[in-house]
Design a protein with these regions (language model features):
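Loop-to-helix transition at the N-terminal end of transmembrane alpha-helices
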Residues: 1-11
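Internal/C-terminal transmembrane anchor helices
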Residues: 84-111
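Alpha-helical transmembrane signal-anchor/signal-peptide segments
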Residues: 110-130
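Active-site rim elements
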Residues: 201-204, 318-327, 338-339, 374-377, ...
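Metal-dependent active-site segment of extracytoplasmic phospho-/sulfohydrolases and closely related
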Residues: 140-141, 330-370
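Active-site His/acidic residue clusters
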Residues: 235, 292-332, 359-368
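Surface-exposed cleft-lining segments at the edges of enzyme active sites
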Residues: 105-114, 265-279, 312-327
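Active-site-proximal alpha/beta segments of enzymes that process anionic O-linked groups
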Residues: 12-39, 46-49, 53-77, 136-141, ...
Length: 471
């Protein structure tokens, strides 16, 4: 863990800056070799941070960016070393440790165990008799990573009509044109569970099971289950799901994983999956979907398919084909899930949803370096669009809510399984992008389904949509 994370970089830096320097001092200046070793160690240990955001690469080149960092590091260290050796070493060590210290302080402030989570909103909700759940159906929320809408898929060149037909034949309502108010998995899905526009805690805190929606269902006798492929979604807050997998959080695997990212040169979005066997996750997923429990269950899972781009800032030649292959895998998984649920839990509420878009247009990542006028409808769909389909049991009188974003899932469910039919309007979040839209789509936003800014300013985000546009 922490010891591993600190000791390995120290050994690495010492080896490059002193051991190799001593060995090669016979062939050149000891001082210049030491400075070169320090500069190289500094750049390598900060490589993941340097390359993390492709939009900041100089001239759009990772190679040029890394080279300039090395030259600048060497120059700064040389000047400091010429002035005062002690100051040089203190400055380098302080800079390397400052990131870890700041991260630790921020994490501690988010997760102070002495703080009692405010439950005022929960208590207010539970006091109102009409908010009591009267249709205690099992609820299954199946999140498919970056699963796009039909309109967006057609733009990419992928025909998903067969899957749509399968869903409709199995009593699913397709909410065409749905999108998320967040463009990342954590920001998007945490708000599905917490139902808050501005989150007061780290996003992982809510995915740990500390969320309003889960508390409401627990208070109504539900068992909550959170199933994930890896602990990427779990932060250091207490994990409050009644049952969950894996039994780790993201901090437990930090040392080796972060060092691996450093020496690879960048943070892969799926690097946390490397230590976890997907077959175990899939087996547990199938077991939960096929099991029957005396108590009502709220089951939540987030799978890996179809997946999104590799976020390097340059689209791979086979980027779309990789996504299409992922779509095929996701569709097979979806069919299996639905067949299992229809056989074992036919009266359950089933949600099929994407979390955000796959990032396949322009540079296949964030668009902050683009002029806003260059950002079109499909660029926005590509980052914020998210598929949504819901199977409503036939004995529920489903209200005609204007479902528009994936964060509408639980406001709609609670409005339909309680006697409070206006709960949807009371709980729904803003129909706009809530964070990072300056980075993701160069400041373009969406308000109530209409694009604000960019090439398609004042036009609907989706032409093919199930909801009514409201000003």
């Amino acid at each position: 863990g922490l010891l591993y994370l600190v000791s390995i970089p120290f050994i690495f830096s010492y080896f490059f800056s002193f051991v190799l320097t001593s060995l090669f001092s016979y062939f050149g200046s000891y001082t210049m070799l030491k400075i070169s070793g320090l500069a190289l160690s500094f750049v390598i240990l900060n490589m993941a941070q340097i390359t993390n955001n492709p939009t900041t690469h100089i001239f759009g080149s990772q190679f040029i960016t890394q080279g300039l960092y090395l030259i600048i590091s060497f120059t700064v260290i040389y000047l400091l070393y010429s002035f005062n050796k002690k100051i040089t070493f203190i400055a380098i060590i302080a800079f390397m440790l400052s990131g870890a210290v700041i991260s630790f302080i921020n994490n501690a402030s988010f997760n102070d165990p002495n703080k009692i989570r405010s439950n005022e909103k929960l208590q207010t909700f539970l006091k109102y008799k009409k908010n009591e759940i009267i249709y205690k159906k099992n609820i299954y929320v199946l999140i498919f990573e970056s699963y796009a809408n039909k309109e967006t898929l057609e733009f990419y060149g992928f025909n998903n009509s067969e899957q749509i037909d399968f869903l409709e034949d199995n009593n699913f309502t397709i909410y065409h044109g749905s999108y998320s108010n967040g463009a990342r998995s954590l920001s998007s899905t945490s708000r599905i569970l917490e139902l808050k526009n501005q989150l007061s805690k780290d996003e992982r805190h809510y995915l740990n099971g500390n969320a309003l929606v889960l508390d409401i269902f627990k208070a109504n006798g539900y068992k909550t289950v959170g199933l994930f492929k890896s602990p990427y979604a779990f932060g250091s807050s207490p994990i409050s799901w009644d049952e969950y997998y894996p039994k780790d959080d993201v901090t437990k695997i930090g040392g080796k994983t972060i060092l691996k990212a450093i020496y690879e040169g960048y943070f892969r979005f799926d690097i946390f999956d490397d230590n976890y066997d997907n077959s175990t996750y899939l087996k547990l997923r199938n077991n939960y979907l096929s099991s029957r429990d005396d108590n009502p269950t709220l089951f939540y899972t987030h799978g890996e398919h179809p997946g999104h781009s590799q976020n390097s800032g340059v689209c791979l030649k086979n980027e779309k084909q990789k996504y299409f292959d992922g779509m095929e895998k996701a569709n097979l998984q979806m069919k299996n899930d639905i067949n299992v649920l229809k056989k074992n839990n036919p009266e359950s509420i089933i949600i099929i949803a994407g979390d955000h878009g796959p990032y396949l247009t322009k540079n296949c990542t964030a668009l902050m370096r683009y002029n806003q006028k260059e950002i079109n409808r499909y660029d926005v769909q590509d980052r914020y669009g998210a598929f949504l389909a819901i199977n409503w049991p036939k004995d529920i009188d489903v209200q005609d809510y204007n479902i528009q974003i994936i964060q509408d899932i639980f406001p709609a469910i609670l409005g339909n399984i309680t006697n409070n039919k206006i709960l949807f309007n009371q709980l729904k979040l803003d129909r706009r992008f809530l964070d990072e839209f300056d980075e993701r789509v160069a400041g373009v936003n969406v308000k109530n389904g209409v694009i604000i800014g960019g090439e398609d300013d004042n036009k609907p985000l989706f032409e093919n949509r199930s909801y009514q546009l409201k000003k």
